[in-house]
Amino acid sequence: MATLSDIDVDWAWSAFQPGESHPRGSAQWDLRGAAHLLRRAGFAASLADLNAAVSGTPAEAVDRLLAVDQQPPSFQQEMADLTQATLGTGNVRGLAAQWTYRILNTPVPLLEKMTLFWHGHFATSAAKVEDARLMLAQNELLRRHAMGDFSRLLLEISRDPAMLIYLDSVSNRKAHPNENYAREIMELFCLGEGNY
């Protein structure tokens, strides 16, 4: 079993190249390869996570990462309690701190990495939405669909109250249509400029 002193910081943060051996001459699937995989599919990894990954094959490590429905009930309860406490303050910054805690402690890092990816893709602003509950609901929507069908995610996000507020759909009227919602959904989020 590897120890923390076995990890060389320089190679741990260098790009992993399949087929390359470790600088010390060990096999390809080692701590370096596992560290690369877990950084790419998550945010970081503990030594225990690295040891668990190298104890099996690369395919088994990937299968564990893709098992996004494997959140222990204790973690789900901890997050529910933290969310309720945060929502009680009404502070959107508290939600950001709560999410950071979740990212750092999640047993399913790929799910949070994909939630963050979709959060960046379907951008909204808490300053414009001005409702912590709506921002939380949007984050939960992104998490629910993070690893699923893009068309379903797009449909759900197009109905999301935070997104509707952010894209000015609340000011859209028959006599005075606001094209921002349709343009953003079509052009920025799915088809690209001029492809609709």
Where do the PLM segments sit?
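N-terminal module-boundary/linker segments of secreted carbohydrate-active enzymes
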Residues: 1-94, 103-105, 109
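Primarily short, surface-exposed interaction patches in extracytoplasmic proteins
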Residues: 28, 45-63, 87-196
